[in-house]
Amino acid sequence: MVTFFSKFKYCCEFIRFDFQAFPQMFRYLITISLILFSCEQPILYHATAESIKKKIESEKDNQAILLNFWATWCEPCVAEFPMIVDMADEYENDLAVYFISVDWLDEEDKVLSFLKDQGVTWTTFIKDEKDQEFINGIHREWSGALPFTILYGKTSGEVVDFWEGEQPEKRFRKAIINAINS
């Protein structure tokens, strides 16, 4: 009988162990374990403006994309969060939703706890860059106010809408449908 650990040991024989990559490898092992044991948990990656742009570039041909920049201490962010999660489920075939937390890195556990409470089981990000550098790198018209939402068109891959501040469901829905059809 082949066990998980024997499979893991076999796979590791082909991987050169790198102590600098240990935190990332540990995250992958946790993710694999959660998948194997059917425990869906949010995955939180550290991100810079550049890495987020690369993620968008790699995904833009498949679906419309919604980026939501938020923080656990931001009341309007927390208020609109469940609505965005519901819309992510509703439009899952046509819309990729990425939450990017701008909380401090030492608040990572708090961010993960909030994501879990909200039922987020997909890849999310936490800002790992100085505030102004991050803000300027994301969008030239973003003042830094939260929440901040950007939508990229499904076909065009270009920014089709963006806004600062909490918005009603009607505004989100109209913008999402426009992004899916753009």
Would you name each region that the model predicts?
Residues 63-65, 69-73, 104, 145:
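Short pre-active-site segment immediately N-terminal to redox-active cysteine/selenocysteine motifs
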Residues 11-12:
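Cysteine-centered motifs
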Residues 81-118, 131-136:
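Structural microenvironment flanking redox-active thiols in thiol-disulfide oxidoreductases
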Residues 28-37:
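Sec-dependent N-terminal signal peptides
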Residues 120, 127-175:
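Thiol/disulfide oxidoreductase modules built on the thioredoxin-like
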Residues 2, 23-28:
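Positively charged n-region of N-terminal signal peptides that target proteins for export
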Residues 69-86:
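Conserved redox-active cysteine motifs that mediate thiol-disulfide chemistry
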Residues 43-65:
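A short beta-strand-turn-helix
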